[in-house]
Amino acid sequence: MADSTGLQFTVKVGALPENTFVVAEFALDEALNRPFNLRLELASAQPDIDFGAVLDQPCELLVWYNGELQRRVCGVVSDFAQGDSGFRRTRYQLMVQPALWRLSLRQNSRIFQAQKPDEILSILLQEHGITDYAFALKNEHAKREYCVQYRETGLDFVNRLAAEEGMFYFHEFEVGKHRIVFADDSAALTAGPELFFNLGNRSLEQGPYVRQFHYREAVRPSDVELKDYSFKTPAYGLSHKKVGAELTHQRDTYQHFDFPGRYKEDPSGKAFAQHRLDALRNDAVAGSGKSNSSALQPGQTFSLTEHPNDSLNTDWQIVRIQHTGLQSQALEEEGGSGPTVYHNEFGVVKASTTWRARIGSPEAPHKPMVDGPQIAVVVGPEGEEIYCDEHGRVKLQFPWDRYGSSNDQSSCWVRVSQGWAGGQYGMMAIPRIGHEVIVSFLEGDPDQPIVTGRTYHATNRPPYELPANKTRTVLRTETHQGEGFNELRFEDQAGKEEIYIHGQKDLNVLIENDAAWHIKHDQHTDIDNERVTRIKANDHLTVEGEKRDQIKADYSLTVDASLHQKLGQSLLVEAGSEVHHKAGMKIVMEAGAELTLKVGGSFVKIDPSGVTLSGGSIKMNSGGSPGSGSGWAGQMPIQPGAVEVVAPPPPMDPARQIATLKSAEPVCEICEQLARQEGGG
């Protein structure tokens, strides 16, 4: 307990008795969006204090005046050192920081999906045992579809994420504990003391005061314009602009333009533009000063009064402050007998201003960039072989993601680069579950992965053994939900050049006009079942050599008009049983030299010398009857199956589509064409 008179500093460390240490001096640095840093010079009658009783233990510094508590600061001991020892006292040095500081000791890479920023921050805090935190948020913060902590400490990630969302944080202190408060508007600040401006003729007994106050204005960017791109709305600009206030003392032409703005929807774009402007102008109107009020701290405002410049007699908020205290009488052996003194130096902005951290400053580090492409594996739900969405995007498992379960929750939907991509034309090859892919990152941003390549590895081997088949260029697929494959292969070995096609089931070819084949050597066709061909016009066949056909069953030929046959030499027909010719009108058989009909030993021979009939008996109009044939019993051919006809893209409707070009709704490639025609975008 402190004395009832004067200024005094006391400290309590862990479970050690309260009188273990006396405070010789301290320095406390506090700022918005930074863990505070308390440095203590202590003295103790014990020369051998157990370090285990101090390090990583709670520590509380109290500032008293006339027995009344003025300020409390509590945190955890991050650094402890023993200094010089005398006859009665040993000096020690302590470093005290908030529990939030522990996040700086752990670097990680992990993925957060479909969570609001405050939910992400809560997870990080709770994982480090921090339960005393609060969110005093005025604005709505959208869920982040995909947010990566990438090779950065938890503290850097917290600072960066808070700054990106326009949040700032500060600490509040209670008995034995401290709370971190995240806010996004100056309305969350608490009202602090009223401090008069002391021209030098008033003492502390008359109340805490400000003994120095400097006012400053600086030229800063006047407005911000951010722009981004979304493949879901490719023709929409996603551009947002915000103009600063209080520009009367500077030009309004200092625009800060940036792309990408790190957003994909308008509400986030508008908010991010305002956050960027506030951060760039966070010291455009500012003040600094010195006071003796230990109650001042970030997250508070104070009212300045009695300043000769009346415009400065207003409410200010603390952005940063450095407290210094000296208690000389704690060092008895060194003749310490001076008074206990305290003072601080502070930086402020107007209380109505919402201060936001500038990205790239100590309060908000830049987002880590991915140095180059990475390897990942395509993943999806159990039992699936191919898993994608309507845009052909896939889910990935990165080797560094220790939290992913190699399923459809491992990442966001990730776009896949194709060899050619137009409006309903181009190439499409969906990486399948288990495939290894090369992932690039737009602008090096870990939040924006895109698959740009595919690679084999030790278990996913190439289709053919290498390097034995190094001359082969192969496109081989794998049957989905079954066994088999389709393949297109090119062999480039000299003397063995080949194009090979394998289809696991069907081959369908649709040619809208002509098809020409020129085979300079042999063609071999082997069909295990039927061949069905339909020609809607004419069929022309020229064989310059020999033609041989063998039909092991029946052969049906139906000609709706005439059949013309012309042979240069002989027509030789042999039937095992019967040859039957039937004509509806007449049959004419004409020979230049001889015509013979022969059955057994009987025959009729007609030649230029006459007609010769020979037989066992010759009957002329004396009974008997003609023989009959089997008659025509041929089969009509079946018709070929239909080939799938893929419809071309629908025609454009300019009146409707031009009207939507500049909307935030998704548009198609046809709209993109119109945008180029209209000069829009």
From Swiss-Prot:
Compositional bias of kind Polar residues: 289-309
Region annotation (Disordered) ranges: 284-309
Residue intervals passing through the bilayer: none
Highest taxon above the source species: Bacteria
Consequences of knocking out this gene: Deletion positively influences motility while it has a negative effect on biofilm formation.
Listed SUPFAM superfamilies: gp5 N-terminal domain-like, Phage fibre proteins, Phage tail proteins
NCBIfam families from the UniProt entry: vgr_GE (TIGR01646), VI_Rhs_Vgr (TIGR03361)
Job of this protein: Part of the type VI secretion system specialized secretion system, which delivers several virulence factors in both prokaryotic and eukaryotic cells during infection. Plays an essential role in bacterial mobility and biofilm formation.
Family: Belongs to the VgrG protein family.
Protein name: Type VI secretion system spike protein VgrG2
